[in-house]
Amino acid sequence: MDKKRDYISPSDLTFLWNECKKCLWLKYNHKISTPGFMPLVGPMSAFQESMYREKATSYLSSELAPGVVSDWGKKVISKPIVIDGVETNWRIEGKYDLVITFDDGSLGLIDCKVTTSEMDADKVSHYRPQLEAYAYALENSLNEESKKVSETGLMMWRVNGAEGEPEDSFSFKTSHQYLSAGRDPAAFLGLVKEVINCVEGEMPESGDDCKNCKYVEKRTNII
């Protein structure tokens, strides 16, 4: 018998939770995941991440406190999540992009993103649950020494053009910006409480704008 899922993926707090709670419930209870088609996301993120390894924080942004990018691309697993003083059956598990060690010993958690849209506060609001999930795992690590996370944020690259010659090579041009998300652990725990109640409860209704559920419904009606 397959082991029952006992972890929450940080990205699900940003995407699935907001898009369709029914799809989230199916994924966590029956291991049914909607097919994804974003072949460039992984490679682009890896290229972006590689540019900041072992760099001083001033290389990323003048807004960051003194420190250095000390870790990247590592899997992190939290201890069981505690909600309202009660230990749940769930933990956080995922792979972060960049971790900064600041001069004061605290950590910064940075997620790398490539976009074609505006780099603004809406991006911070959208990705904050994901950032807080990684921060929670670092502060409540199952296998590593737990450390305080004093900052989270997004390193955004916006693709805005291309250049090059046929006899040489082509490359995309980007502008870049660091967007600080700060910390909001209380809001994160409140959200996780809702997520756990959802996946441990009855199957919810489809999201109003869930393209996957609409596709399944239309297909089922035909065949």
Q: Where are the regions a protein language model picked out?
A:
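Metal-dependent nuclease catalytic cores that hydrolyze phosphodiester bonds in DNA/RNA
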Residues: 1-106, 116
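Acidic active-site catalytic centers that drive phospho-/nucleotidyl reactions
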Residues: 97, 111, 130
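Short beta-strand-loop-alpha-helix junction that forms the active-site gateway
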Residues: 112-122
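Short alpha-helix boundary/capping segments
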Residues: 122-129, 180
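Active-site-adjacent bridging/hinge elements
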Residues: 103-111, 187-189
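Metal-dependent nuclease catalytic regions and adjoining charged, substrate-binding loops involved
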Residues: 2-10, 140-223
